[in-house]
């Protein structure tokens, strides 16, 4: 149920505009993923890069910022996502920010239908081995501690009604189990046929306004509640969660509008054997 709710969220027209806010949190990790991938130091030419499940294009933005003009003058950058609204958003971003030799297109991350042995670097997870060139690099990131979930759990538990809410581990397991720890991530990549696997846990200290944090959490609520609440609980209590979130943040942080958070992700890079 949670996976279907997540898919419905990705496909909704409102998702792209709301998801842009998430770059406040995902942006620093996108740059770290690019740094860890080694793409800047790569001697492979031309670079043929896939930003798979690209969202609003935050990884592609980091790539464009990190690589020099000569490299980008000959590269090929494909931004793929299953959401038509996000593809439209990224195509507009490509024009607005002047990304050379870049395009956005509809791509199902789990069945890309893209050509085999084509890309030098892929940023994402599914089906990467087939479409990578021999010697190509995959770089992925997955949440280990999405701190917004901890905040939402505390706020919901303060509401009347003894309402259930998942732990971080329970929620992540309901989506893709095993990608939130270093060793299982390493094992999964090696089992897929990759070598030179490197895995690290990284965190970023951020400060977000209360209202921004509430707006970041709201779009994810249907994904959580669709898995862990009954229809009756949702009908009665879901509409009260934003108010509960604001109340929790006001109680915890007082007059200060800044909320310190330190989300944590697993970053992994691996190579397709030559």
From Swiss-Prot:
Its EC number is 2.1.1.-. It is an enzyme of class 2 (transferase). Signal peptide: none annotated. GO terms for molecular function: methyltransferase activity. Acetylaranotin bis-thiomethyltransferase involved in the biosynthesis of acetylaranotin derivatives, members of the epipolythiodioxopiperazine (ETP) class of toxins characterized by a disulfide-bridged cyclic dipeptide. The first step of acetylaranotin biosynthesis is performed by the NRPS ataP which produces diketopiperazine cyclo-L-Phe-L-Phe via the condensation of 2 phenylalanines (L-Phe). The ataC domain of ataTC then catalyzes the formation of bishydroxylation of cyclo-L-Phe-L-Phe. One of its GO terms (biological process) is methylation. It comes from Aspergillus terreus (strain NIH 2624 / FGSC A1156). Belongs to the class I-like SAM-binding methyltransferase superfamily. It comes from the Eukaryota. This is Acetylaranotin bis-thiomethyltransferase. The lineage of its organism: Eukaryota, Fungi, Dikarya, Ascomycota, Pezizomycotina. Disruption phenotype: Diminishes greatly the production of the two bis-thiomethylated analogs of acetylaranotin, bisdethiobis(methylthio)-acetylaranotin and bisdethiobis(methylthio)-acetylapoaranotin. Induction: Expression is co-regulated with the acetylaranotin gene cluster.
């Amino acid at each position: 149920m949670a996976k279907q709710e997540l898919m419905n969220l990705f496909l909704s027209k409102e998702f792209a505009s709301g998801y842009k806010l998430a770059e406040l949190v995902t942006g620093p990790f996108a740059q770290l993923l690019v740094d860890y991938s080694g793409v800047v130091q790569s001697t492979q030419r031309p670079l043929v890069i896939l930003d798979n499940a690209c969202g609003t294009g935050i990884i592609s933005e980091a790539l464009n910022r990190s690589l020099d003009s000569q490299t980008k003058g000959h590269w090929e950058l494909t931004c793929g996502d299953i959401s038509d609204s996000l593809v439209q958003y990224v195509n507009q971003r490509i024009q607005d920010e002047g990304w050379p030799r870049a395009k956005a297109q509809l791509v199902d991350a789990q069945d890309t239908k893209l050509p085999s042995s084509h890309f030098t670097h892929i940023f994402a997870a599914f089906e990467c081995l087939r479409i990578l060139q021999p010697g190509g690099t995959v770089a992925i990131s997955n949440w280990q501690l999405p701190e917004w979930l901890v905040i939402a759990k505390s706020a919901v538990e303060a509401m009347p009604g003894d309402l259930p809410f998942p732990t971080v581990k329970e929620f992540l397991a309901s989506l893709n189990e095993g990608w939130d720890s270093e060793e299982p991530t390493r094992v999964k990549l090696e089992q897929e046929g990759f070598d030179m696997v490197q895995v690290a846990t990284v965190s970023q200290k951020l400060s977000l306004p209360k209202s921004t944090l509430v707006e970041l959490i709201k779009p994810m609520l249907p994904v959580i509640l669709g898995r862990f609440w009954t229809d009756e609980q949702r009908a009665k209590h879901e509409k009260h969660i934003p108010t509960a979130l604001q109340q929790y943040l006001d109680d915890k942080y007082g007059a200060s509008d800044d909320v310190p958070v330190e989300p944590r992700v697993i970053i992994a890079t691996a190579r397709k054997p030559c």
